[in-house]
Amino acid sequence: MSVATAALARTPFTGNATTGELTHWRAVATEVAQSLAVDALERDRKNEQPHAEAQLLRSSGLLDLLVPAEFGGAGGHFETAFEAIRILANADGSIAQLLAYHYFNQTGIAFYAPAKQQGAWWERTVAHGWLWGDSVNPVDPTLLLTVEADGYRLNGAKRFSTGSGVGEVIIVNALVQGGENDGKVLAFVLPTDREGLELVDDWDYLGQRLSASNSVRYSNVRVDAAEILGEVTEEPVSTLLIPGLQLAFANFYLGIAEGALARGKQLLLGRKNAWFLSTAPTYSRDVIFQRTLGELKARTAAVAALVEKLGRAYDLLIAKAGDVTAEERAELAVAIAEAKIVSTETGVEVANRIFEVTGTSSTSNDVGLDLYWRNVRTHSLHDPVDYKKIEVGQYFLHGEAQPISLYT
């Protein structure tokens, strides 16, 4: 029952997205976003588990975008997935988060499982239409796996388990006690209806209300040996999962900023008069408001250029699989940390300052402009951006990377 720790010989991801691939999935994501936009505010206020939204993602094909074509998926690239996340965030940051976490939970197959075992996992996720949640929050006490015949028993609890409320399966990390894997952290997959696994519907926060990020409790949950993906190690290619997830964050912060700008523009153009001290005929013709929007738009465009570049770079490095070096991994992780910094600050600033051009009337509860700020403000606290700044500064000054963790 020992878990192999050999380097991954390959990943199923190769090359970069074609123009055709990007065009197709942009159209799919845009259609989904338009559907989400219709009642985003109403759904946010209800604060219910997003089962209908999960089904929308499933029926659109977005859940299987990254599954290799040889196993029944779309055979897409991370660059395309990042863009889909960004487009959805224009309309609904919660569902963009749900999709982002799904992608990196699902592709844990490639990051953790031995190559010869990956095909069966990919085929199962397609056949059953799985949405993948997670239960790996590292700031909670460690989950414990206790050895028993042909498997384990899992005990403990995790908060902030994104997607667990609506996912068919969740990926879990836990520390093994006893046996030949004693002291190892294993990644494994559990169905959310497993006996002893309790989904606690306690996600009631300022924003990202529909990300299904509730708590999960485990009471002597059976974990079969066949449900183990592999060991969580510091092998360079397997540890690229976390920078990839951080880049997904940058994309949905960017998408929220773009959504706030679009909604702000709509509201500003709808204002028919002007401030009484202005000589402009309308608010939208007032250079003060034009200047503010110009500044916010330019900053958002700069973030977009950076994350698009990094999406392509991520695909290229993932394709090297076991040949990825620690130095290459560190360089890309720091570049993604830079994107995390500017996307966080730009997203929060845009979602906040958009009110400067839309006026008091835009704070009405039925307008819902606050949804963008509440969403980006909530998730941008996931890990302190100041530590990302330190990570970048340390690498720039000394060429020293931060220790590998579930945040770096």
Predicted regions and their residues:
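Intrinsic disorder at enzyme termini
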Residues: M1-E21, K389-T408
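Charged, amphipathic alpha-helical oligomerization/scaffolding segments
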Residues: V28-E31, I256, R263, E295, ...
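C-terminal helix-coil-helix/basic helical segment that borders enzyme active sites and/or dimer interfaces
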Residues: L41-D44, A301-I341, F355-T358
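Glycine-rich flavin
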Residues: Q49-S59, D64-V166
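DPxDG-like acidic metal-binding loop motif
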Residues: A157-R194, G359
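Glycine-rich phosphate/pyrophosphate-binding beta-alpha loops
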Residues: R159-S164, L245-F249, H382
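Glycine-rich beta->alpha junctions and the first turn(s) of the following alpha-helix
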Residues: Y205-A301
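Glycine-rich phosphate/cofactor-binding loops in nucleotide/flavin-utilizing enzymes
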Residues: T358-T408
